[in-house]
């Protein structure tokens, strides 16, 4: 008879969602195992921008992992009409996912979690109120399972919790830049060039991450848009191979099943349609999953309704609003760009973003943003120019 070590919770995937859930559970003295098929540290394609709502989500300092911070943003339409929007509050902190993810899983391990990397899960079954997990080398059992294994993860493929029918796509490449010249590059979003999406520049410490994002998953030539943009910028990619990844939106339809298997982050489809942001929703969903599971372990009953309520209130509601705003924005360029880049919307968005508000919170607390804007507390400027 094969012996299987049992844990209270097993988490498949050690990205921000899985690692932070493990950290929260381990802090609560819950016996948790994290399994990832890759050996850490590992490369992870991601622009690596932490918005204020993302970097405010951690209950430990992350300053040592930050490559670059900015209180300004440049937006453009077809790389011609530019708006340089700045103020006195931090909007985004840049990280490198390879290092950041390794940092997060180490925080979980330091708190008491067990981590097995370089181990692939090959089969999962749910029987007699527990999960059996088969890997390429071992077997494990648990009462609660968290799927943090991305858009094509085995957890959702096994249990079909949410249909993977809404998603976009992004490609990126790092371009080396000397420390002396990194200040010449701003965090930039160019709309109108890539259909239903944007081009981006995210400065780090000794390189810039340049990428292209589209909400149209069927687009075939997104790589060409990116390479043309890099050439116009006068940059040289660090390699010839572009890295691509899916941006999921299908989490707006997430419904938690009765049995205690919870999806988090990209596995749950928690990505933002308009901006493509994902790290905040990864950490937020990991936090919610950990808190509900901790409470459920104490009570002895999985509280599915509590998890669904919190997902709905704290994640899905904002994602749905971002989805419809994004649909309007990309479907009505350049009118929508000019509208959004006018003084009042820019000011409200700056105040909301710097306060770490989600889309739905931005609307419910618009009076706070307006008050700060009228008093010019953030010293916001919106300089328009042409190239």
From Swiss-Prot:
Q: Name one GO molecular function term.
A: oxidoreductase activity, acting on the CH-CH group of donors, NAD or NADP as acceptor
Pfam families given for it? FAD_binding_3, GGR_cat
Out of the domains of life, which is the source? Answer: Archaea
Protein family (similarity comment): Belongs to the geranylgeranyl reductase family. ChlP subfamily.
Q: Under which name does UniProt file this protein?
A: Uncharacterized protein Mbar_A1602
């Amino acid at each position: 008879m094969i012996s299987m070590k049992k844990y209270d919770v097993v988490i498949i995937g050690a990205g921000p969602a899985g690692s932070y859930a493990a950290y929260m559970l381990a802090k609560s003295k819950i016996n948790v195992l994290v399994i990832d098929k890759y050996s850490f540290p590992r490369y992870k394609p991601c622009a690596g921008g932490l918005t204020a709502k993302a970097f405010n989500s951690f209950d430990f300092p992350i300053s040592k992992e930050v490559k670059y911070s900015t209180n300004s943003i440049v937006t453009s339409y077809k790389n011609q009409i530019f708006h340089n929007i700045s103020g006195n509050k931090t909007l985004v902190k840049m990280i490198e996912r390879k290092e950041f993810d390794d940092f997060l899983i180490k925080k979980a391990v330091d708190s008491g979690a067990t981590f097995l990397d370089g181990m692939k899960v090959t089969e999962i079954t749910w029987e007699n109120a527990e999960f059996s997990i088969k890997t390429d080398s071992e077997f494990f059992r648990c009462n609660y399972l968290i799927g943090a294994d991305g858009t094509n993860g085995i957890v959702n493929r096994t249990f079909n919790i949410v249909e993977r029918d809404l998603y976009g796509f992004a490609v990126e490449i790092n371009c080396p830049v000397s420390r002396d010249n990194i200040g010449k590059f701003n965090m930039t979003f160019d709309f109108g060039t890539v259909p239903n999406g944007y081009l981006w520049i995210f400065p780090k410490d000794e390189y810039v991450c340049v990428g292209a994002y589209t909400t149209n998953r069927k687009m075939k030539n997104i790589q060409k848009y990116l390479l043309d943009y890099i050439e116009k910028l006068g940059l040289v990619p660090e390699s010839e191979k572009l890295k691509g990844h899916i941006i999921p939106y299908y989490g707006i339809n997430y419904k938690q099943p009765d049995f205690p298997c919870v999806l988090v982050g990209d596995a749950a489809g928690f990505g933002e349609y308009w901006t493509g942001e994902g790290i905040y929703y990864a950490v937020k969903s990991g936090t919610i999953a950990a808190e509900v599971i901790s409470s459920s372990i104490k009570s002895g009953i999985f509280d599915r309704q509590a998890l669904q309520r919190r997902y709905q209130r704290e994640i899905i509601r904002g994602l749905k609003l971002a989805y419809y705003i994004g649909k309007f924005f990309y479907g009505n360029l350049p009118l929508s760009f000019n509208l959004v880049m006018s003084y009042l919307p820019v000011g409200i968005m700056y105040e909301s973003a710097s306060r770490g508000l989600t889309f739905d919170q931005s609307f419910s607390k618009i009076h706070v943003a307006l008050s700060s804007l009228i008093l010019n507390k953030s010293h916001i400027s919106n300089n328009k120019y042409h190239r």
